[in-house]
A protein has these predicted regions:
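Conserved ATP-dependent adenylate/AMP-binding module captured primarily in the ANL superfamily
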Residues: 154, 171-201
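A short N-terminal helical cap/helix-turn-helix that marks the beginning
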Residues: 40-58, 76-100, 118, 128
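Conserved AMP-binding/adenylate-forming core of the ANL superfamily
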Residues: 96-134, 141-148, 155, 172-177, ...
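AMP-dependent adenylate-forming
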Residues: 57-61, 68, 86-112, 130, ...
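Short beta-strand elements of ligand-binding domains
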Residues: 144, 167-168, 191, 209-217
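Structured binding elements
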Residues: 161
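ANL superfamily adenylate-forming
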Residues: 8-33, 196-231
Length: 231
């Protein structure tokens, strides 16, 4: 049974390559996969196929968007699909294609899918060392503007099942302190002037391990820099 579905998935992929889905019953395939006890690898393969734009356009033209999306949600839940699987798959498929564009010191820097996944793994390994140091679950806080190192921490947490709490920069020091306490943040990553200012205003009564995402010279307390974190 699975080999038949595997064949049909291969036919869909070939149709995608040929840009012709006229003879492909996507809805029937999704419903069959949804109704049977299918291996996780096949579920992943189906979800891989479903991400192509030509598939979305085909479903939209058939006026079956709601049914399709409901099927996809069910398959995602059954497969336990997660951020790490998504990035890993994109790295395998798109390799050196650009995943992120970053402005760094006024210059455009690109990061490929393969490089991004490698960086996420490196960050995840560093985060796992925190888990080994304690017998209770850790909670990561992110007090930073949108920057690469912060993105890596966020993606690593989502990829490897670590609880992460983004903390808004537009709050007061009282708001920040409240979130740190009530979210039970155990490790806080700090970046940028605003993030640093908020931390300096609340750090005096916090026993939170703090890591600087970039420059740590202006931060108060015992701060681990990014390079030390990755060691």
């Amino acid at each position: 049974m699975h080999s038949e579905i595997q064949q049909r998935l291969e036919q869909v992929f070939q149709a995608i390559q040929n840009k012709n889905l006229e003879k492909i019953d996507l809805m029937g395939l999704s419903q069959e996969i949804q109704s049977k006890d299918i291996s996780r690898d096949i579920l992943y393969e189906f979800l891989d196929i479903a991400h192509f734009n030509i598939i979305a356009n085909h479903i939209s033209e058939s006026n079956q968007v709601d049914i399709w999306l409901n099927n996809l949600v069910d398959i995602i839940e059954r497969s336990k699909y997660h951020t790490g699987r998504l990035i890993k798959h994109r790295a395998e498929r798109y390799k050196n294609k650009t995943a992120l564009n970053i402005i760094e010191k006024g210059e455009l820097k690109t990061i490929s899918y393969s490089s991004l996944w490698s960086l996420v793994i490196e960050t995840g390994c560093a985060l796992s060392s925190f888990e080994k140091e304690t017998d209770r679950p850790i909670t990561i806080g992110l007090l930073t503007h949108n920057q690469l190192n912060g993105v890596l921490v966020d993606l690593a947490c989502l990829s490897f099942g670590i609880r992460v709490v983004p903390i808004p920069l537009n709050g007061t020091s009282e708001h920040t302190s409240y979130i740190l306490d009530h979210a039970e943040i155990t490790h806080l990553f700090i970046g940028g002037k605003t993030g640093g200012k908020l931390w300096n205003e609340v750090q005096s009564d916090k026993s939170i391990q703090s890591i600087a995402l970039n420059d740590n010279e202006s931060l108060k307390g015992q701060i681990v820099n990014w390079e030390q974190f990755l060691e």
